[in-house]
Amino acid sequence: MGHIKKGELTQEEKELLEVIGKGTVQEAGRLLSSKNVHVNCLDENGMTPLMHAAYKGKLEMCKLLLRHGADASCHQHEHGYTALMFAALSGNKDITWVMLEAGAETDVVNSVGRTAAQMAAFVGQHDCVAIINNFFPRERLDYYTKPQGLDKEPKLPPKLAGPLHKIITTTNLHPVKIVMLVSENPLLADAAALGKCYRVMDLICEKCMKQRDMNEVLAMKMHYISCIFQKCITFLKEGENKLDTLIRSLLKGRASDGFPVYQEKIIRESIRKFPYCEATLLQQLVRSIAPVEIGSDPTAFSVLTQAITGQVGFVDVEFCTTCGEKGASKRCSVCKMVIYCDQTCQKTHWFAHKKMCKSLKDVYEKQQIEAAKHKRQEEKNGNPNVSSNHVNEDQPEAEEGITQENSIPSDSVEGEKEAANDTGLASAQDAPTGPQLSEE
């Protein structure tokens, strides 16, 4: 099959397109082994089998087609859509990632001038937008694992490439999350290893700014992660388990409202240290953050996240109070006002939250009373279905959780003494667990 024309499908190719929609991977594999099937055949609209599989959200089918040589960057669709665009429109994060790993081009535009990320944003698939905007090909990192020019050793030991790539491609830029990713990997949790990593990040940042098609967003992300790595090195040099100390410092809230001032200052400092002061993105970030008083909205983290990942703040989704991970669903059983990924994050944050838990519980109960009063008024007026901005009535009542008195561990007094230290010197592993978590 030397050339491929739209709509000129063999019987087996027509069967393949049907199997992609309704059949099994095994059936598709059998058809792909036929000499009468071209893996990049085009239907009458210029769609390849891979585009069909991506649009229908068939992950294993996509992997099979790619193994058989499917072109992830095919641009023959009548409206200029690519497999990556269909994956992003479907909202399937795994397929979007697979397409990117297969070499799908991210800057191709369709007939209305939109890229895959822009199409995903248009239909509200913000997770896919973040994945595309944060993708960094492993090959670009592997370049630094080989000696270049007169170098006798590579700038990055090959064993560090995998763990570092995981952090580079993360869509969660919360400093606590980055420190956690470093801490949980023995290869990275070493001052010398992190030193090599942050220097490579700085080189990538420089390359992004000096290349012909300048990439300020990626440069800022590399610089920011480099700054977090350097902060990790400072704490690691103080002794064992000092990354736990850094995490506690980032989470420690001020007495008045629990706002993590140190975390805010670290992020602002990282942005301020960006070495290319003429960059448009830097100027936008500074204009958005500088006038804001520490503790007010928007926070430096929210502004930076929106600029780098493309995620928007108004999306109706919860984030973990500890690590910023999206989709957290476990509420503190006492105050029901803070949300976590799991008990690990809840335990890590308890040293800071225990000082605010009771006051937050009071706020929650007042909201419940106001919501109940508002609901009764709606029913009295004969209009019970009018939407309200108050706390969701479906949330469990505060009394159903563990009572505040029983929730404070016996060592809470010791914890209060620890909290007086600005950097929170105790290990997060020693932190009391506090109240249990409840499903949202």
From Swiss-Prot:
Keywords: ANK repeat, Cell projection, Cilium, Metal-binding, Repeat, Zinc, Zinc-finger
Primary location group: other
Annotated Zn(2+) 2 binding sites: 332, 335, 353, 357
Pfam family, one: Ank_2
Self-association and partners: Interacts with the retinal-specific guanylyl cyclase GC1.
Cellular localization per UniProt: Cell projection, Cilium
PANTHER family according to UniProt: ANKYRIN REPEAT AND MYND DOMAIN-CONTAINING PROTEIN 2
Signal peptide start and end residues: none
Superkingdom to which the source organism belongs: Eukaryota
Ranges where the record places region Disordered: 371-440
SMART domains membership: ANK
GO MF, any single term: enzyme binding
Protein name: Ankyrin repeat and MYND domain-containing protein 2
ANK repeat segments: 45-74, 79-108, 159-188
Function as written in the Swiss-Prot or TrEMBL entry: May be involved in the trafficking of signaling proteins to the cilia.
List of residues binding Zn(2+) 1: 320, 323, 341, 345
Zinc finger (MYND-type): 320-357
SUPFAM superfamilies assigned: Ankyrin repeat (SSF48403), HIT/MYND zinc finger-like (SSF144232)
Bias-annotated ranges (Basic and acidic residues): 371-381
Cellular component terms (Gene Ontology): cilium
Organism listed in the record: Mus musculus
